[in-house]
A protein has these predicted regions:
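Signature for HUH/AEP ssDNA processing cores
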Residues: 1-108, 117, 191-193, 197-218
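DNA replication initiation modules
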Residues: 73-90, 94-95, 115-219
Length: 219
């Protein structure tokens, strides 16, 4: 293992430890496919422990000593993620109040983290352009109950070299503990407008519209 990979693996270990301390469940992912390397459904209700994480990094997972991480979203970890997989999706999220200060820089966009409200509420996963209760924007997805998101310091590898590292981009005036102040309440309350394009009266063509005259309505 090269020195670069050793440093990255230590950073990933530290990231996993931080997640567990936050009460967030993480699982190992394949570097090549983003697919989980374990049967992970049980961890939607069961705690991922420090001991389990240490075993992954010590012994590997399914013969893999190099792997990425994902955080399980939803009530189990107390978080949800607005997943912007394109710059178009990022711009839409920024215009429509779907962002938070807790940002992960991904390969093509950003992940915005919010606090899951708990109290028995459920927020299912959403895919941009599918369904009526989520904006029809390609690349704008939602990771909620039953989902997961690639977690820092996961990497994208091409030709055996690291092309990108998933990293936190949080303003200096915040830390992850402040996420409790950014509770997700659902798209209806969160977004300014549910449609892809903002409506403007200035865009209407009124050229052939006549002004109202009361005399026109007289018999």
């Amino acid at each position: 293992m090269t020195e670069e990979l050793e440093k990255w693996r230590q950073a990933l270990h530290d990231s996993a430890t931080q997640a567990i301390e936050m009460g967030w469940n993480v699982i190992p992912l394949s570097i090549d496919s983003k697919k989980p390397l374990i049967e992970w459904k049980e961890y939607q209700t069961k705690e991922v422990t420090h001991e389990l994480v240490e075993r992954w990094f010590r012994d590997g997972v399914g013969g893999n000593h190099l792997f990425n991480l994902a955080v399980l979203t939803g009530a189990v970890s107390g978080i949800v993620v607005v997943d912007c997989d394109s710059q178009e999706a990022v711009k839409y999220a920024e215009r429509h109040n779907l962002t938070s200060p807790f940002v992960v820089e991904t390969t093509r966009g950003k992940h915005f983290y919010f606090k899951h409200p708990g109290k028995g509420q459920q927020f299912r996963n959403k895919v941009g352009g599918v369904g009526r209760d989520w904006p029809a924007v390609d690349g704008l997805d939602f990771r909620g109950d039953g989902g997961y998101a690639v977690f820092p310091c996961s990497i994208k590898v091409k030709d055996k070299s690291i092309q990108h590292v998933y990293t936190w981009n949080i303003p200096d005036t915040f830390d992850l503990g402040d996420i409790d102040d950014y509770v997700w309440h659902g798209i209806a309350d969160q977004a300014i407008l549910p449609s892809e394009e903002e409506f403007s009266f200035g865009s209407l063509n009124l050229e052939n519209v006549k002004a109202f005259n009361p005399e026109d309505s007289l018999p």
